A protein has these predicted regions:
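A short LG(V/I)-centered, amphipathic sequence patch enriched
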Residues: 40-59, 78
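Short helix-boundary/capping micro-motifs
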Residues: 12-26
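The N-cap/first-turn positions of alpha helices
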Residues: 2-5, 29, 63
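Short alpha-helical "packing" element that flanks the helix-turn-helix/winged-helix DNA-binding module
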Residues: 8-12, 66
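Residues in the recognition helix of alpha-helical DNA-binding motifs
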Residues: 35
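Alpha-helical linker/hinge and terminal dimerization helices associated
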Residues: 42-43, 66-88
Length: 88
């Protein structure tokens, strides 16, 4: 799992839309979808409900459970970067 995948997941949950998240992250929608699919394959479960006619992105039960983990992962990543930048 990569920082870019976690970032994509959190941005989709924040915006409620794959297209809005892609625009905010300056990537194409297909590229964003690939990040999410790679993450779901690694985790072994879907994070989002997929289907035609859905106006807003819906999280699966597992997706809801994963939000807190993703936020902690992102915070730890940021702490690690800051510590490395401040190291002598």
């Amino acid at each position: 799992m990569t920082f870019l995948e976690i970032e994509a997941f959190l941005k989709i949950t924040e915006t409620g839309s794959f297209s809005a998240a892609a625009e905010a992250l300056y990537v194409t929608q297909p590229a964003l979808g690939r990040r999410i699919r790679a993450m779901e394959e690694e985790l072994g479960y879907p994070l989002f409900v997929r289907g035609k006619g859905l106006r807003k992105v819906e999280l699966t039960r597992q997706g809801h459970a994963f939000i807190g983990i993703a936020h902690r992962w992102q915070a730890l990543w940021n702490e690690t970067r800051e510590a490395a930048l401040l190291a002598p």
